[in-house]
UniProtKB/Swiss-Prot annotation:
<dbReference type="Pfam" id="PF05728">
    <property type="entry name" value="UPF0227"/>
</dbReference>
<dbReference type="InterPro" id="IPR008886">
    <property type="entry name" value="UPF0227/Esterase_YqiA"/>
</dbReference>
<dbReference type="GO" id="GO:0005829">
    <property type="term" value="C:cytosol"/>
</dbReference>
<protein>
    <recommendedName>
        <fullName>UPF0227 protein YPO1616/y1776/YP_2238</fullName>
    </recommendedName>
</protein>
<dbReference type="GO" id="GO:0016788">
    <property type="term" value="F:hydrolase activity, acting on ester bonds"/>
</dbReference>
<dbReference type="InterPro" id="IPR029058">
    <property type="entry name" value="AB_hydrolase_fold"/>
</dbReference>
<comment type="similarity">
    <text>Belongs to the UPF0227 family.</text>
</comment>
<dbReference type="InterPro" id="IPR022987">
    <property type="entry name" value="UPF0227"/>
</dbReference>
């Protein structure tokens, strides 16, 4: 089973396309939609829904995948739920770049500080990060610098921030998922 978390643009038709692409890895892809506007509520909701999906799915090698803001959540929720994660262009600093788009961007600082101390060290090698060299929204080099000590970084030379085409990375994701 693969859980898919959308980015800030929850209504983008690209989300459906990504789910269809992920079904080449596993036919059981669960799209979990969340508000994107209320970070604390989103975290509680996502924890509950992802845990429920894992319990119902019965796949010992479940995976959570997210793009942009969904990548922020995939890393944290996947860690807390004990499953591997794939993050495409994860937005690691929504408190800096989501002002005016969400009600309380400062809640992301609170969430980051309340996550288990050193969680990335404890999560080492359990997240695969795919970054676009042409991300028009985020500083990919900064993201790589923060995550490279803990996770494998895969660079993509064609996609932009929304990462419409996952297909060049599906085999790598499939291999990563089989590691459980």
């Amino acid at each position: 089973m693969i859980v898919y978390l959308h980015g800030f643009d929850s209504n983008s038709p690209g989300n459906h396309e990504k789910v269809l692409q992920l079904q080449f890895i596993d036919p059981d892809v669960r799209f979990i939609s969340y508000s994107t506007l209320h970070p604390r509520h989103d975290m509680q909701y996502l924890l509950k829904e992802v845990d429920k999906a894992i319990q119902q799915g019965g796949d010992e090698k479940s995976l959570i995948c997210g793009v942009g803001l969904g990548g922020f959540w995939a890393e944290r929720i996947g860690f807390l739920c004990g499953i591997r994660q794939v993050a495409f262009n994860p937005n690691l600093y929504p408190q800096e770049n989501m002002s005016g788009k969400i009600d309380r961007p400062e809640e992301y600082i609170d969430i980051a500080s309340k996550c288990i101390d050193g969680f990335r060290e404890k999560n080492r090698d359990r997240c695969l990060v795919v970054l676009s060299r042409h991300d028009e929204m985020l500083d990919s080099q900064r993201t790589a610098g923060d995550l490279h000590p803990y996770y494998e970084i895969v660079w993509d030379d064609k996609q932009n921030h929304k990462f419409k085409d996952l297909s060049p990375h599906l085999q790598r994701i499939k291999a990563f998922k089989t590691l459980g």
